[in-house]
């Protein structure tokens, strides 16, 4: 093993075919199941599974998400490699709107697919995988863990709960149908139950077209005004080092408790002061348009 292993070398050793480091790349790796040659463009409501980067990171936001964090209970690298190879094959089928495996005609065994997405199209399903610092520790691969992948520092007013902290890997399923997203994660975990257990999961929704409008959160304020786009997005999101993570990215998932009942009793003026923006336009205090400069003296 060299000091600076290639992405391909890491993928071969670890068996992460469609998963990198929270979250890596979706390039085809040696030893991975080879998908059938594409003769036609992707079908309507279908986002290709393979690409220069994992889908689901800079992909236009879908309407629904199902996010899961799991703990490994195996340190057998070969078993984990087989699990990721299985997930690669399953994910390719799921993003095409297919079953994870064809149904068997044997009535005396459980169906190969749980079936709740039967007859539904892919609804732009994307599956994004990531691994955490403990993943490298459990598989005795610390020498491959990037230095930047470390535990977060304590933030003021943190009230972290152990049940929703840490974990070894994550699966993010995004789709324009909640049942499609849930079905995908359910079947991926079902096929890997000998190697992992679910630590926590979270469903979410978004009813705005993020390509043309900044979404609003449940406090009714625009959320994502400062998000990068275009070339700036590529510079900020994708890793460009000379190691195996080149083309991958990092992810932080934090559950935030929203006290809606208290918020609903808060005056509009105080709501504006809390965010430093006007609720209707999203403009900074003292301005008229959402993307005008912020005057911090007014907040």
Please provide the spans of the model-predicted regions.
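N-terminal secretory signal peptides
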Residues: 1-6
């Amino acid at each position: 093993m060299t000091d600076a292993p290639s992405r391909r070398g890491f993928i071969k050793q670890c068996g992460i075919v469609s998963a990198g480091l929270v979250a890596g790349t979706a390039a085809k790796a040696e030893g991975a199941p080879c998908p059938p040659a594409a003769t036609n463009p992707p079908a309507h409501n279908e986002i290709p599974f393979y690409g220069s980067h994992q889908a689901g990171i800079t992909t236009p936001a879908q309407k629904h998400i199902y996010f899961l964090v799991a703990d490994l209970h195996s340190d057998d690298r070969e078993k984990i490699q087989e699990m990721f190879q299985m997930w690669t094959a399953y994910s390719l089928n799921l993003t095409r709107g297919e079953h994870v495996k064809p149904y068997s005609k044997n009535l005396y065994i459980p169906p190969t697919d749980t079936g709740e997405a039967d007859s539904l199209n892919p609804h732009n399903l994307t599956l994004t995988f990531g691994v955490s610092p403990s993943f490298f520790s459990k598989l005795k691969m610390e020498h491959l863990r990037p230095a930047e992948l470390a535990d977060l520092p304590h933030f003021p007013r943190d009230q972290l709960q152990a049940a929703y902290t840490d974990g070894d890997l994550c699966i993010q399923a995004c789709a324009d149908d909640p049942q499609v997203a849930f079905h995908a994660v359910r079947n991926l975990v079902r096929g890997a139950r000998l190697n992992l257990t679910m630590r926590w999961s979270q469903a979410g929704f978004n009813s705005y077209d993020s390509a043309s409008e900044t979404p609003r959160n449940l406090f009714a304020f625009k959320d994502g005004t400062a998000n990068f786009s275009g070339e700036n997005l590529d510079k900020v999101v994708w890793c460009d080092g000379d190691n195996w993570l080149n083309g991958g990215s990092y992810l932080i998932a934090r559950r935030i408790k929203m006290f809606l009942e208290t918020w609903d009793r808060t005056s509009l003026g105080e709501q504006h002061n809390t965010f430093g923006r006007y609720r209707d336009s999203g403009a900074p205090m003292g301005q008229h348009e959402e993307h005008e400069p912020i005057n911090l003296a007014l907040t």
